[in-house]
Amino acid sequence: MPPLLNALQLRLQHQFAEPALLQRAVTHRSFSADNNERLEFLGDSVLNLAISSLLYQRLSSMPEGDLSRVRANLVKEGTLHQIALRLQLPDLLRLGEGESKSGGKQRPSILADAVEALIGAVYLDAGYAAGEKVVHHLFEGVDINPHMRAAEKDAKTALQEWLQGRRMKLPQYEVVATTGAAHRQTFEVACAIAELQLQARGTGASRRAAEQTAATAMLELLKARHA
């Protein structure tokens, strides 16, 4: 294994049984068809579950809505970007020439996606317990306290709380299209609420941004329907 990847293992505190997973986790789609997008998808779910469990234990008296808001603050792009910098991911990312020249190695969305991909890679390599352990390690330096609930709600959190307040299932987000050059992509995401047979779409320069736009559009639909 290359020395830089071996050093990343040490920072993650996880030794990979399948080193190819680690290599894939730091490979952007602009570099290869064997890239980290599917790992990112998996890691997003592992991250949310691990953080949910952590908050449930640490903030035992906090109501559900506030827990959702704290979690949204913890797993947002800005937090994951800071974790990526601590892991020194800009030195490790494999990007296509165009993406690299356009500053992709410093782009917060790409770095945040790589953190999720690493979590997904650990999960595939050794299971959920190992993935949860790595998540807890990565968030050791992140402040987790009840005051985070006072932060402004983003659209996804607001939509989730609206549905939970009516005992409805959470919305499903799906990337339905990706357009543009690898270094300047636009993502289109569909947000669906099956119980209401509603769907809204949004676009953005990253999956996260597109999900927020789709959630905003869905909130507008709900507002119009329930006005």
Swiss-Prot record:
Disulphide bridges: none
| rRNA processing keyword on record | yes
User: Which positions in this protein are listed as binding Mg(2+)?
Assistant: 40, 113, 116
Localization of this protein: Cytoplasm
- The UniProt record lists the RNase III domain at 5-127
Alphabetized CDD domains for the sequence: DSRM_RNAse_III_family, RIBOc
Q: What is its EC number?
A: 3.1.26.3
* Catalyzed reactions: Endonucleolytic cleavage to 5'-phosphomonoester
Sequence ranges assigned to domain DRBM in this UniProt record: 154-224
- List the InterPro entries: dsRBD_dom, RNase_III, RNase_III_dom, RNase_III_sf
Its function, per the record, reads: Digests double-stranded RNA. Involved in the processing of primary rRNA transcript to yield the immediate precursors to the large and small rRNAs (23S and 16S). Processes some mRNAs, and tRNAs when they are encoded in the rRNA operon. Processes pre-crRNA and tracrRNA of type II CRISPR loci if present in the organism.
Q: Which family does it belong to?
A: Belongs to the ribonuclease III family.
What quaternary structure, including any partners, is listed in this protein's UniProt entry? Homodimer.
Q: What is this protein called?
A: Ribonuclease 3
Q: Highest lineage ranks of the organism?
A: Bacteria, Pseudomonadati, Pseudomonadota, Betaproteobacteria, Burkholderiales
